[in-house]
Curated annotation (Swiss-Prot):
Molecular function (Gene Ontology), one example: CMP kinase activity
Annotated source species: Thermoplasma acidophilum (strain ATCC 25905 / DSM 1728 / JCM 9062 / NBRC 15155 / AMRC-C165)
Entry keywords, A to Z: ATP-binding, Cytoplasm, Kinase, Nucleotide-binding, Transferase
Protein name, per record: Cytidylate kinase
Catalyzed chemical reaction(s): CMP + ATP = CDP + ADP; dCMP + ATP = dCDP + ADP
Classification via Gene3D superfamilies: P-loop containing nucleotide triphosphate hydrolases
Name of the gene encoding the protein in the UniProt record: cmk
């Protein structure tokens, strides 16, 4: 089984993916880690690499094609990233698609803590990054990243701890699979 976990900045994608991996034993592939590593290799910050990617679509294509190839070649995996669900959907890859949701303020606080910066700086960075990503993905793939209709489950991460969220997701996948409710939606 393939599981994709998507969500906006600070929604808990990486943390929940790690917890779900602990429960399932599945390997986690993080497109965010790959994107950050590519930026680092180019001696750029994430923000600079986002700006670079706006005029160099090959940067996004490279990241997304790597993610797609990994999904196609592997099973029993968790693929975590902003576009993970969309990449599986657009490429007809059978996957259980999860979207993690949190309010803007919660995401902002989490992002500031993760980056070890003040709230105002976090707000500026988060808004620039999300605006850049939304516009790039619309131009590159014709998708609206705020369209949640492709997801099998949307989870609010506000009020549960990551281990609880992972258990909830694992239980929902198991329940839907056993009842044969889960029929992955594949774009044709």
């Amino acid at each position: 089984m393939r599981i994709t976990i998507a969500g906006k900045i600070g929604s808990g994608k990486s943390t929940v993916s790690s917890e779900l991996s602990r429960i399932t034993g599945y390997t986690v592939y993080s497109s965010g880690t790959f994107f950050r590593e590519t930026a680092r290799k180019m001696n750029m910050s994430i923000e600079d690499f986002n700006v670079y990617s706006e005029s160099h679509p090959e940067a996004d294509y490279y990241t997304d094609e790597t993610q797609k190839a990994f999904m196609q070649a592997n099973d029993n995996i968790i693929v975590e990233g902003r576009l993970a669900g969309w990449i599986s959907y657009l490429n007809g890859i059978n996957a259980f698609r999860i979207f993690l949701y949190a309010t803007y303020y919660t995401r902002l606080v989490r992002f500031a803590g993760r980056e070890n910066i003040d709230i105002d700086s976090a707000r500026d960075l988060m808004e620039k990054r999300e605006k850049s990503e939304k516009e790039r993905y619309r131009k590159l793939y014709g998708i609206d990243v705020d369209d949640l209709s492709i997801y099998d489950i949307v989870v609010n991460t506000e009020f549960m701890k990551p281990p609880e969220i992972a258990v909830y997701i694992a239980n929902r996948i198991d329940e839907m699979s056993r009842k044969d409710i889960f029929t992955p939606r594949i774009l044709r």
